[in-house]
Curated annotation (Swiss-Prot):
Residues 20-33 form a propeptide. Keywords: Carbohydrate metabolism, Glycoprotein, Glycosidase, Hydrolase, Polysaccharide degradation, Pyrrolidone carboxylic acid, Secreted, Signal, Xylan degradation. Its EC number is 3.2.1.8. It comes from the Eukaryota. This is Endo-1,4-beta-xylanase 2. Residues 1-19 form the signal peptide. The keyword Cell inner membrane does not apply. It comes from Hypocrea jecorina (strain ATCC 56765 / BCRC 32924 / NRRL 11460 / Rut C-30) (Trichoderma reesei). Residues 34-222 form the GH11 domain.
């Protein structure tokens, strides 16, 4: 699967009224969990990004703290998740939850850099399609309890954080799939650099669920 390039989500505001305690609790619960339209923004202290290609069939919801959920059925191409803006080159990212794809989907640490423009993935889990299919393996790195295979692919005249562009994608694909754990990003970025895959100035960095004409559900918390 060539990557489904992504980004973007929106924020909703909720006004409160003086009411009985039960009503106040309900208001807080609604405020903490928001089903949103495609866009980018901040929610409960975390940056979020949600994008889809307009096919529908996807419900992305921001929850409390670093939690988000996605439910999709007969969807097109989408990606959504929570993290940081900007990201860093040495962050240890924790994630936990459930990930239940049926078809073509990824769960990954996902982000971009500028100058050079790079889209990158540290793939922790995936559905029926291995994203390394058809790509040339450049190396491998052992980190966080598994070997990851390293690849580089290119996208030509595709959507990006600066509009339509041609850019490289860097990949680390975990051999032992998981839906919870910690990712030491520096281990991957250093291993990529040893293969000549350099990153520029960091843009956003999130834990993302991505899908491509598939179905499934996920509920992930990042920190």
């Amino acid at each position: 699967m060539v990557s489904f390039t992504s980004l973007l989500a929106g924020v909703a505001a909720i006004s409160g009224v003086l009411a009985a305690p039960a009503a106040e609790v309900e208001s807080v619960a609604v405020e903490k969990r928001q089903t949103i339209q495609p866009g980018t923004g901040y929610n409960n202290g975390y940056f979020y990004s949600y994008w889809n290609d307009g096919h529908g069939g996807v419900t992305y919801t921001n929850g409390p703290g670093g939690q988000f959920s996605v439910n999709w059925s007969n969807s097109g191409n989408f990606v959504g998740g929570k993290g940081w803006q900007p990201g860093t080159k040495n962050k240890v990212i924790n994630f936990s939850g459930s990930y239940n794809p049926n078809g073509n989907s990824y769960l990954s640490v996902y982000g971009w850099s500028r100058n050079p423009l790079i889209e990158y993935y540290i793939v922790e889990n995936f559905g029926t399609y291995n994203p390394s299919t058809g790509a040339t393996k450049l190396g491998e790195v052992t980190s966080d309890g598994s070997v990851y295979d390293i690849y580089r692919t290119q996208r030509v005249n595709q959507p990006s954080i600066i509009g339509t562009a041609t850019f490289y994608q860097y990949w680390s694909v975990r051999r032992n799939h998981r839906s919870s754990g910690s990712v030491n990003t520096a281990n991957h970025f250093n291993a990529w650099a040893q293969q000549g895959l350099t990153l520029g100035t960091m843009d956003y960095q999130i834990v993302a669920v991505e899908g491509y004409f598939s179905s499934g559900s996920a509920s992930i918390t990042v920190s």
